Structures are given as C-alpha cells and as structure tokens.
Amino acid sequence: MSGRGKGGKGLGKGGAKRHRKVLRDNIQGITKPAIRRLARRGGVKRISNTIYEETRGVLKTFLENVIRDAVTYTEHARRKTVTAMDVVYALKRQGRTLYGFGG
C-alpha cells in the first residue's frame, strides 16, 4: 500500500477529465423577490432599491467563507464529497452553530 489508508485510491492513470462549464455571474440567480422574501421573514416592511446588490455581495462573501472551510474539512478527511457535517463544522468554526443536521 502507498500509505493512503483504506481503498487503493491514487492508483492507476486516472480516467478522462470531463469538461466543466465555467460558472460566471450566478449570484444574479438570487432574485429580487427571493431577497425580498428573506427580508420579510426578518421583519422588514420596506426595502430600498440599493439593498439587492449589497445583499448579493454580502451573501457571496459569506458563502465563499463557509464553502472554503467546508472543503478544507473534506480534503483533510481525504474525501471528494462535502457532507452536511462539513458545513456544520465550518459554520461552528465561524461562530454560527447550526443545530439539526447531526453531530
């Protein structure tokens, strides 16, 4: 074995690489009505027009940080699939404990 633990991972030449579409500007998929619904849930009555782009920016930054931490946990465990627990631990690390998803 090559010191990789269980399974013979890392052996062979590897398969063909698939082309993956480059994702750009997907933050616009967070629509104005979706942001409005989130604000309503938070108790907001009126929403300024400038809020939508600002909210998208803040959400993008937040998700980048959480996903970066979750992927770090995944890589440390030598897995290729990010689990719900990886996200829970990533949120806990940032001081935002989330209950109800195991652990």
Swiss-Prot record:
SMART domains: H4 (SM00417), TAF (SM00803). SUPFAM superfamilies: Histone-fold. The nucleosome is a histone octamer containing two molecules each of H2A, H2B, H3 and H4 assembled in one H3-H4 heterotetramer and two H2A-H2B heterodimers. The octamer wraps approximately 147 bp of DNA. Belongs to the histone H4 family. Core component of nucleosome. Nucleosomes wrap and compact DNA into chromatin, limiting DNA accessibility to the cellular machineries which require DNA as a template. Histones thereby play a central role in transcription regulation, DNA repair, DNA replication and chromosomal stability. DNA accessibility is regulated via a complex set of post-translational modifications of histones, also called histone code, and nucleosome remodeling. One of its GO terms (cellular component) is nucleus. Residues 1-14 have a biased composition (Gly residues). Its main location: nucleus. The sequence of H41 is shown. GO terms for molecular function: DNA binding; protein heterodimerization activity; structural constituent of chromatin. Residues 1-20 are annotated as: Disordered. This is Histone H4. Residues 17-21 bind DNA. Keywords: Chromosome, DNA-binding, Nucleosome core, Nucleus. It is found in: Nucleus; Chromosome. It comes from Physarum polycephalum (Slime mold). It comes from the Eukaryota.
